[in-house]
């Protein structure tokens, strides 16, 4: 899945779109995506000017976006103005190594279960085959409140 198809499913746009390409997709089971981390990312200006590191919360957000793609593409639900994909929980988040400019962040999301419209995933971010972060994420799609 290239960036054009990703934009059909995710409502995120620059500077908060954190998935560049989907490398593998198994409907209802798993998705592997890629984020190319460059020095041009706006967060590196302040985090940290003399030693740029991608904020851990943004690594988790990238994982949540990969999980969203897994759910939305599995359900064949494209982004629209009537619904929103909510990040509703995170458990067991761990950060194992910093993510720096020049890294290719591999984002892996695997469905653990789905119940009453709430999806739970095992999520892992890797750089060069080494774990950068991992967590269990919970997300849901709901109608947008007016």
Curated annotation (Swiss-Prot):
Q: Which GO terms describe its molecular function?
A: (3R)-hydroxyacyl-[acyl-carrier-protein] dehydratase activity
GO biological process, alphabetically ordered: fatty acid biosynthetic process; lipid A biosynthetic process
* Alphabetical list of SUPFAM superfamilies matching this protein: Thioesterase/thiol ester dehydrase-isomerase
Major location category of this protein: cytoplasm
One cellular component (GO) term of this entry? cytoplasm
Where in the cell? Cytoplasm
Mind telling me which InterPro entries this protein's record contains? FabA_FabZ, FabZ, HotDog_dom_sf
Q: Matching NCBIfam families, A to Z?
A: fabZ, PRK00006.1
What is the protein's given name? 3-hydroxyacyl-[acyl-carrier-protein] dehydratase FabZ
């Amino acid at each position: 899945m290239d960036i054009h198809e990703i934009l059909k499913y995710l409502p995120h746009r620059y500077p908060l779109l954190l998935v560049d390409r989907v490398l593998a997709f198994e409907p209802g089971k798993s998705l592997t995506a890629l984020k190319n981390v460059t020095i041009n990312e706006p967060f590196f200006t302040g985090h940290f000017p003399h030693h740029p590191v991608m904020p851990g919360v943004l690594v988790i957000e990238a994982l949540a976006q990969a999980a969203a793609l897994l759910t939305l593409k599995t359900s064949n639900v494209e982004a629209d103005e009537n619904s929103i994909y909510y990040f509703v929980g995170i458990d067991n988040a761990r950060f194992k190594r910093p993510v720096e400019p020049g890294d290719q962040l591999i984002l892996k999301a695997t469905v653990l279960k789905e119940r009453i419209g709430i999806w739970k995933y095992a999520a892992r971010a890797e750089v060069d085959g080494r774990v950068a972060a991992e967590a269990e994420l919970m997300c849901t799609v709901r109608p947008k409140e007016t």
